């Protein structure tokens, strides 16, 4: 399968380029960076410190996507919306690991997914998506009257959005388990005199510092007992592995908007 890596000079872009090079079933056909990037025109090897690969870095989507079967996209929300439209026009699989979308941007991607196959997930890690499945089941079994839910996440100091996309994925899983909308029960940013915790809310605590790739814990706190589900990302390569797995899965599926839960057959 021939793939283009979008956001190639970012942390995840570099991981994806390396991951593609280590696979026999995937060929890196192009890389795309932001317009007027200083990397434009150079061999992609400059991004991963390897021998020349014969692939030129470009900021032109038409050029990058011309010989591809799919796109793997860890960029910015506005850019991912544009790439989804390109993918729909050309019939390319689109794997989206970008986070921080607005409701309007999500709606635009959903429209593009009527014309091509898109897998969009706040976290491409196989472990995190299995964790989300556990959280949903636990939330269903442990009712709001008996157990409070708190989600704690920590990321590196350069992360610009909070709560993290993964924390929201886990929050949505918990909310689905209790048949409520996360936006109606979410609680974050506690400070000063807050009063007692409101029953049924799902709390978020967001920590930032150092080079932490991603730590997430979901705590079910009841009377005299506490259950904690947690996941710690040791390397970004786990996200690249999941994204490539999603691309290979998506090439055999009909048009539509899917998530990693679909890829892992956890949505049933």
From Swiss-Prot:
Active site, UniProt feature: 155 (proton donor/acceptor), 159 (proton donor)
Entry GO terms, CC: cytosol
Pathway: Amino-acid biosynthesis; L-lysine biosynthesis via DAP pathway; (S)-tetrahydrodipicolinate from L-aspartate: step 4/4
Free-text function comment from the UniProt entry: Catalyzes the conversion of 4-hydroxy-tetrahydrodipicolinate (HTPA) to tetrahydrodipicolinate.
Single annotated GO MF: NADP binding
EC identifiers of the protein: 1.17.1.8
GO biological process, one term: lysine biosynthetic process via diaminopimelate
Catalytic activity field: (S)-2,3,4,5-tetrahydrodipicolinate + NAD(+) + H2O = (2S,4S)-4-hydroxy-2,3,4,5-tetrahydrodipicolinate + NADH + H(+); (S)-2,3,4,5-tetrahydrodipicolinate + NADP(+) + H2O = (2S,4S)-4-hydroxy-2,3,4,5-tetrahydrodipicolinate + NADPH + H(+)
Alphabetically ordered keywords of this record: Amino-acid biosynthesis, Cytoplasm, Diaminopimelate biosynthesis, Lysine biosynthesis, NAD, NADP, Oxidoreductase
Enzyme class: oxidoreductase
Family: Belongs to the DapB family.
NCBIfam families, per the entry: dapB
Keyword NADP: yes
InterPro entries: DapB_C, DapB_N, DapB_N_CS, DHDPR_bac, NAD(P)-bd_dom_sf
Protein residues bound to NAD(+): 7-12, 97-99, 121-124
Keyword Ribonucleoprotein: no
Subcellular location: Cytoplasm
Protein's recorded name: 4-hydroxy-tetrahydrodipicolinate reductase
Entry binding sites for NADP(+): 34
Binding site for (S)-2,3,4,5-tetrahydrodipicolinate: 156, 165-166
